């Protein structure tokens, strides 16, 4: 049996651009792609913390260090510049692989610069 597990996420990125008339995708600062291991053209899930929208698209590369997080094409209808989003990618693996797998979690500031990384999510207090 294969499981679908969180491979990586960029937590609380700020949408910097929204380009309705651009070919669909999400452009992501290349530094963030490198830190997460998200490949260009890989499917990603977008969860808008600001408005609750959830959808999927594919990643394309934006200039390294630019802080760009741009939703393009139809995806631009789901967000506004300034929205806080989570960008996530999943991987399929066997149960045996899942036993030792650790995701790459990347946390950013309001300018989409990396503040820290982790491979675990803190336990939520009750």
From Swiss-Prot:
Cofactor binding remark: Binds 1 pyruvoyl group covalently per subunit.
Residue ranges of the TM segments: none
Pathway the protein acts in: Cofactor biosynthesis; (R)-pantothenate biosynthesis; beta-alanine from L-aspartate: step 1/1
One GO MF term attached to the UniProt entry: aspartate 1-decarboxylase activity
EC code: 4.1.1.11
GO annotation, cellular component aspect: cytosol
Keyword Cytoplasm listed: yes
Description of post-translational modifications: Is synthesized initially as an inactive proenzyme, which is activated by self-cleavage at a specific serine bond to produce a beta-subunit with a hydroxyl group at its C-terminus and an alpha-subunit with a pyruvoyl group at its N-terminus.
Reactions it catalyzes: L-aspartate + H(+) = beta-alanine + CO2
Active-site residues per Swiss-Prot or TrEMBL entry: 25, 58
Gene3D superfamilies: 2.40.40.20
Any one of the GO BP annotations: pantothenate biosynthetic process
Quaternary structure and interacting proteins, as annotated: Heterooctamer of four alpha and four beta subunits.
Functional description taken from the UniProt entry: Catalyzes the pyruvoyl-dependent decarboxylation of aspartate to produce beta-alanine.
Alphabetical list of PANTHER family matching this protein: ASPARTATE 1-DECARBOXYLASE
Protein name: Aspartate 1-decarboxylase
Organism lineage: Bacteria, Pseudomonadati, Pseudomonadota, Gammaproteobacteria, Lysobacterales
